[in-house]
Amino acid sequence: MEQSVRSIDGARSVAGAGRTIIDRESINQRALQLLQRNRQRRLLLKRSEDRARYIPERREQKRELDETLETRNVPQHHISAHERITKAKSHGSKYKPSDLALAEIRKYQRSTDLLISRMPFARLVKEVTDQFASDEEPLRWQSMAIMALQEASEAYLVGLLEHTNLLALHAKRITIMRKDMQLARRIRGQFI
């Protein structure tokens, strides 16, 4: 009876080792796909920005705006007292903090740039790997490897924060809390 249990456990451990190799390969393929997709998005975004520079309609609109501003530059003694008062009272519309936050969210959703700075992230990666490497020969990193790690880590963080936000909304709250993130990681099957 014990031998059959041992053989089953042995088979499980061999199958588990094969699965980890396959998992590593699939993770590498996924990271490469993410890198390629983000490169394509960046190129498309640059192209659309370049095209927007050469649209003649915008030039005409800007010229009209400049002309209207020039006509408004009238000496102060020609403006009535009522116009001076109304001009002084009118301020630029101040946006609410919630509107600013939503605009910032839309801005980051449109862009495909990396949000974590490259140099601090590279320093963090090297610091962590130096703990596992020997003192005689530290590990060396290619820039593409660090970029792939950064891409994967940002994708992971964005997904985790999305799930955390959903859990906060489920609890009828807007503010995310530590317990939301812990529950999100627990549901995903990761350690707290």
UniProtKB/Swiss-Prot annotation:
PROSITE patterns reported for this sequence: HISTONE_H3_2
Main location: nucleus
CDD domains: HFD_H3
One term under GO cellular component: nucleosome
SUPFAM superfamilies reported in the protein's UniProt record: Histone-fold (SSF47113)
UniProt signal peptide: none
SMART domains: H3
Alphabetized Pfam families for the sequence: Histone
Chain positions covered by the region annotation H3-like: 88-190
Keyword presence, Nucleus: yes
InterPro entries for this protein: Histone-fold, Histone_H2A/H2B/H3, Histone_H3/CENP-A
Keywords attached to this entry: Centromere, Chromosome, DNA-binding, Nucleosome core, Nucleus, Ubl conjugation
PTM entry text: Ubiquitinated. Is degraded through ubiquitin-mediated proteolysis when not protected by its association to the kinetochore.
Record bears the keyword DNA-binding: yes
Localization, UniProt: Nucleus; Chromosome, Centromere
Sample GO molecular function, one term: structural constituent of chromatin
UniProt xrefs under Gene3D superfamilies: Histone, subunit A
Function: Histone H3-like nucleosomal protein that is specifically found in centromeric nucleosomes. Replaces conventional H3 in the nucleosome core of centromeric chromatin that serves as an assembly site for the inner kinetochore. Required for recruitment and assembly of kinetochore proteins, mitotic progression and chromosome segregation. May serve as an epigenetic mark that propagates centromere identity through replication and cell division.
Assembly notes: Component of centromeric nucleosomes, where DNA is wrapped around a histone octamer core. The octamer contains two molecules each of H2A, H2B, CSE4/CENPA and H4 assembled in one CSE4-H4 heterotetramer and two H2A-H2B heterodimers. Interacts with the inner kinetochore.
Family recorded in the similarity comment: Belongs to the histone H3 family.
Protein's UniProt name: Histone H3-like centromeric protein CSE4
